[in-house]
Amino acid sequence: MTTHQSIRRLSRIAALVGLAFVAGTVAAADGKAELQALPEAKAGNADMVELGKHLFFDTRLSGDMGVSCASCHDPAKGFSDGMPLSAGYPSVEYFRNAPTLINSRFKNVFMWDGRLDGADMGTLVRDMLTEAHTMNMDSRLMQERLSQVPEYVAMWQKFRKDDINGMRVYGVVGEYVKTLVSQNAPIDRFLKGDGSALTSQQKDGYEIFTGKGGCVACHNGPLGSDGQVHNTGVPENPEVLKNPNRTVTLLRHYATSGMPNYMNARTDLGHYAISKDPADMNKFATPSLRELKYTAPYMHNGMLTTLDQVVDFYNQGGGQGSELTPLGLSGSEKKALVAFLEALSGEPLNVVAPTLPDYQPRQFGKN
């Protein structure tokens, strides 16, 4: 059997068996996995979204008031940060790449290790605000800080009649994040019937993506992700062990996840730290393929800096321990695939940070 036939056979098996191999795969009526256009995004409460936008850019939501959500999810960088490994909380430093927040509302799972349900945006925001290695915020302190900003109190009361509640702030920020959706991506126009939306080279790439390459077996649905965890053998980022701060943050993550024998771990074990199932060693959630033009570097640890490198990596069958099979793509086929991947990016989301209101502490006895 040729490499081409092997890949096509694996793709057919993945599509037919479904839950047994790639649970959550989006399939067409004929059973084959497919890409889909983004669904319409239901508009949220405009007043809640506006407050959420302010809070997204406000450093008062972090423990030392040194970072905001936008520090690691910068609109100018595709709501990512452009670095291989996220800086995380000041002086702590993180051990994974900061993914884009664009299209988060459509995700099946959050986090590279797939530990959070994609339907629960509020929990994602809560974890990012309160985790010691991201924003290190106490909800009670956050509640009091925001309550000392009259403009925020007024904005809050446009959609709620009670006082600002720290636990409810997570949902408010989440409502803003839900508004971050790709705009006018060529792939969406193409999938809706506009044959002119893709160039001839991109169409060739689409055929490779859905055919010879077998990419669609895992990269399907509106995001180009099955929402499952897989081992593609991405090499370790040596910076994690070279930098003691990042090493400590990794081990702290293992400890709080209840991973056995975590002090002996010196690699990022992915979903295993969550499931404790040895079969999940080195497995990470399939990333979205949306907005790749703006969100380099790639993979869970930023080890691949260009889309050409990504395609080369998959063409060779991934890295050590990978579940993948070499694709056998020619140079022109690889270029076509890269061109197609770029078509999954829409127009830049040009978001301007709002002017943030100042504190105006209330006086005791006069509230």
From Swiss-Prot:
Pfam assignment, any one: CCP_MauG
* Record's protein name: Cytochrome-c peroxidase IdrP2
Molecular-function GO term, any one: metal ion binding
Which species does the entry assign this protein to? Denitromonas iodatirespirans
Asked whether the keyword Repeat is assigned, the reply is yes
Q: Where in the cell is it found?
A: Periplasm
Subunit composition? The iodate reductase (Idr) complex is composed of a molybdopterin-dependent iodate reductase (IdrA and IdrB subunits) and two associated peroxidases (IdrP1 and IdrP2).
**What the protein does?**
Involved in iodate respiration. May play a critical role in detoxification of inadvertent H(2)O(2) generated by the iodate reductase IdrA/IdrB.
Binding, heme c 2: C215, C218, H219
Chain sites annotated for binding heme c 1: C69, C72, H73
